[in-house]
């Protein structure tokens, strides 16, 4: 095990870097507190909405459908990235890559059909969907 003198000799550059970072941080915070504005008042506690007087509260309740659609978008977007990577290397992957991509796309389509069948992509409430189904008959 190396003694402390050897460790200090090997890590002096890192210690100098850390001291420089801490010094720069202290300098930037000190200068900003000295030169920055110190205006306090009612208008400082209000949210800024592009110069428009804010109306209503900031606590909006969103439907869970928005979160579901966001998750589905992320999932299918990542899968589109996989397909893009495959399309870049389509010549190198040959027939095996084509078969694998076809299976991957089939799984994607099966997932999309499943989501469609369970109603994950329907925005209307179930009562309205039933009414519209009765009107079509």
Curated annotation (Swiss-Prot):
This protein's GO CC annotations: plasma membrane; respiratory chain complex I
Predominant location: membrane
Superkingdom, natural source: Bacteria
Enzyme Commission (EC) number: 7.1.1.-
Membrane topology: Multi-pass membrane protein
Molecular function as annotated in GO: NADH dehydrogenase (ubiquinone) activity; NADH:ubiquinone reductase (non-electrogenic) activity; quinone binding
GO biological process, one term: cellular response to iron ion
Alphabetized UniProt keyword annotations: Cell inner membrane, Cell membrane, Membrane, NAD, Quinone, Translocase, Transmembrane, Transmembrane helix, Transport, Ubiquinone
Root EC class: translocase
Pfam families: Oxidored_q4
TM region positions: 12-32, 66-86, 95-115
Reaction(s) this enzyme catalyzes, per UniProt: a quinone + NADH + 5 H(+)(in) = a quinol + NAD(+) + 4 H(+)(out)
InterPro entries per the UniProt record, alphabetical: NAD(P)H_OxRDtase_bac/plastid, NADH_UbQ/plastoQ_OxRdtase_su3, NDAH_ubi_oxred_su3_sf
Protein's cellular compartments: Cell inner membrane
HAMAP family: NDH1_NuoA
Family: Belongs to the complex I subunit 3 family.
Function: NDH-1 shuttles electrons from NADH, via FMN and iron-sulfur (Fe-S) centers, to quinones in the respiratory chain. The immediate electron acceptor for the enzyme in this species is believed to be ubiquinone. Couples the redox reaction to proton translocation (for every two electrons transferred, four hydrogen ions are translocated across the cytoplasmic membrane), and thus conserves the redox energy in a proton gradient.
Complexes and interactors: NDH-1 is composed of 13 different subunits. Subunits NuoA, H, J, K, L, M, N constitute the membrane sector of the complex.
PANTHER family found in the cross-reference section: NADH-QUINONE OXIDOREDUCTASE SUBUNIT A, NADH-UBIQUINONE OXIDOREDUCTASE CHAIN 3
Protein's name according to its UniProt entry: NADH-quinone oxidoreductase subunit A 2
Organism: Pseudomonas aeruginosa (strain ATCC 15692 / DSM 22644 / CIP 104116 / JCM 14847 / LMG 12228 / 1C / PRS 101 / PAO1)
Name of the encoding gene: nuoA2
């Amino acid at each position: 095990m190396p003694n402390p003198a050897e460790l200090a000799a090997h890590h002096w550059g890192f210690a100098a870097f850390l001291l420089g970072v801490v010094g720069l941080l202290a300098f930037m915070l000190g200068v900003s507190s000295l030169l920055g504005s110190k205006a306090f008042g009612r208008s400082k506690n209000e949210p800024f909405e592009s110069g428009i007087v804010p109306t209503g509260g900031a606590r909006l309740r969103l439907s869970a459908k928005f979160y579901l659609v966001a998750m589905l978008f992320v999932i299918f977007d990542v899968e589109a990235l996989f397909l893009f990577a495959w399309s870049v290397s389509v010549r190198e992957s040959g027939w095996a890559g084509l078969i694998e991509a076809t299976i991957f796309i089939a799984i994607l389509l099966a997932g999309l059909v499943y989501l469609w069948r369970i109603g994950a992509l329907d925005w209307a409430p179930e009562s309205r969907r039933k009414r519209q189904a009765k009107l079509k008959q």
